[in-house]
Each structure stands twice: as C-alpha cells, then as structure tokens.
Amino acid sequence: MTAPQPHTITPPTPGSKIVLIGAGDVGIAYAYTLVNQGLTDHLAIIDLDERKTWGHVQDLNHAVPWSHHNTRVTVGTYEDCRDAAMVCICAGAAQKPGETRLDLVAKNTAIFKTIVGDVMSHGFNGIFLVASNPVDILSYATWKFSGMDSSRVIGSGTILDTARFRYALGRYFDLAPTSVHAYVIGEHGDTELPVLSAGSVAGTSIHHRLEMIGESADEDVDEIFVKTRDAAYEIIQAKGSTSFGIGMGLARITQAVFSNQDVVLPISTLLQGEYGFEDIYIGTPAVINRQGVRHAVELQLDSEEKERFDHSANVLRKVMGEAGLI
C-alpha cells in the first residue's frame, strides 16, 4: 500500500466535542469517565445497536446532574464528525478467551476501512484516538485510511500496560503507583516489554531498589511483569472483557489533548527513526498536546531491552505485511 497523501496540515477542529464509535464495554467505560470528569461538552455515540446505544445515552445523561459539568450526550451519526474535535474508535470484533490481539487483524482492518472512510467523508478534521485491538496495527491502518498527518492519529498503545505495571510495582514497594515511573513499550500484546533501566521509584532507580532488596527481587519483578502482560487474558476469562482501566487511560489521553498539556504518555504513535524503525505504529512514550502527538520520546534501552523491542516491532511488521498494510 502506498503512503497516504496527508491533508494540508491545519489546526485541528477546536472545542471538545467527541464522537465515540463503538458502545461496547470499553467505549461505555470511556464515555462514563468523560462525563464524570467533564472532559467534553458534547459526546455523540455511534453503534450498530441503536436501541442499546439510546439506553446508554439516557443513562449517561442521568449521571450529568451529579457530575458538576454540563455535558450533553446524544445518539450520534457520522454527520457529527464534521465539527468533532476528536473521534474515538472502540468498535470492532472483541478479543475472545484464548484469542490473541493479533488474531483480530483481518476482521478489524476491514471494519476500520469502512469506519474511517465514513468519518473522513463527513469532513472530519480533528484527532483520532484508537482503542480497538490490535491497537498498534489499527492505529497504523487509521493513519493510512484517513490520509491524516500521523500526529492526528493516536493509539492507546501501552497506556494500560504501563498503568498495570506501575500499580503492581507500587504494591510490591508499598508505595502509591503515582510514585512509580516505569514504562511498558512495544506491541500492546504478547511481545511488549518493561523498561526497567530507565525506571524509578520515589526518585530512586528501580535497579538500585532491587539491589537493596536482594537476589530474589529480580525474579519478583519478572513475575510482576508476566502478570502485567497476561492480565487481560485473566480478566477476560473472569468477566468477559477489560474496560475500566482502558476507559480511564483513554480519558487521560483526551485530557492531555484538550488541555494542551505537553505531557509524556505511553501511547501508540508512528516511529520516524526512533529506536531504528520507521513506518510503524508501536507503544512508546510521546509528548501529547492540542495538536495530537508532538513527538515520540525515545527511551535509552539497554542491550536486552533493545533486542526485545526489535523483536516486538518486527512481529508487528510481519503481521502488517500479511494484512497488506505495508
């Protein structure tokens, strides 16, 4: 597939109107967080199940009086994309028990081609936020199908994996997760990796803290990461889907965009030479502001981390090639 022809780069549509496409568990968790935090003045929800969507819209509107915000929630159509500041895509085939995120490629790429085409044909000029799996590949597909500048297409990437890892490390060190600064990068999936070499806990490097604990600490952290990586499978087995963690992560990205925060978050974005790769969406820290992705932040990886990142990127490249995206 040839590279997309970007639109002339103009400022994204102002305001805070959001069109949410896909009212499943993830989409509605995101919608509830938007209403609760007052991150949008108008949320339009599009889903194939119009009756259920109507029910969600009524339920969310009934939460507004206690939110201290004046959010309007409506059943949306693609016409709503014309003046939307953001379109968040949570639609697509869901991950089933025992199914990997990469197993969803063919089904969801076809779905996305239709969705993104409908969004763009209605004059959308905002920022895409992609949450459907496999998110790195579908973020790349959204960039290709839309013709948008890559800064306008943000994937949720490893924002949830990083949250899970920080939470677990916080429990291990008996500290609040907000005192843990460590990233999970790479594919949002089985080949992701933690970057311990650049991580810190309460201002001290993670490696130093582990040395203070003793020999068993490295094995403990390895086990923590494995549980982080495989958490989705266990949660899906238990309750059918993951929703609250990713809903909050999507809201955090939305806040960073609409508040022009220039904050570093672990998302999926296009690499343009970082880590030695180009033309691939993958999880990495990046600076987020009102224009979307200002730039990716390349972490300094040790040799083992670099080898694992290269493997993750090459796995994604192989699947993208098989799907006809590159």
From Swiss-Prot:
Activity regulation description: Allosterically activated by fructose 1,6-bisphosphate (FBP).
Citing just one GO molecular function, the answer is:
L-lactate dehydrogenase activity
BP GO terms, sorted: glycolytic process; lactate metabolic process
For the modification Phosphotyrosine, the affected residues are Y233
CDD domains registered for this protein in UniProt: HicDH_like (cd05291)
Please state the protein's primary subcellular location.
Answer: cytoplasm
Q: Where does NAD(+) bind?
A: V26, D47, K52, Y78, G92, A93, T114, A131, S132, N133, S156
Keywords in alphabetical order, please. Allosteric enzyme, Cytoplasm, NAD, Oxidoreductase, Phosphoprotein
Reaction(s) the record says it catalyses = (S)-lactate + NAD(+) = pyruvate + NADH + H(+)
Binding-site list for beta-D-fructose 1,6-bisphosphate: R166, H181
**Highest taxon of source:** Bacteria
SUPFAM superfamilies the UniProt entry points to: LDH C-terminal domain-like, NAD(P)-binding Rossmann-fold domains
Q: Where in or outside the cell is it found?
A: Cytoplasm
> Its pathway?
Fermentation; pyruvate fermentation to lactate; (S)-lactate from pyruvate: step 1/1
User: Entry's PANTHER family?
Assistant: L-2-HYDROXYCARBOXYLATE DEHYDROGENASE (NAD(P)(+)), L-LACTATE DEHYDROGENASE
Report the function annotation for this chain.
Catalyzes the conversion of lactate to pyruvate.
Q: Which family does it belong to?
A: Belongs to the LDH/MDH superfamily. LDH family.
Q: How does it assemble?
A: Homotetramer.
Q: What is this protein called?
A: L-lactate dehydrogenase
The record's gene field reads ldh
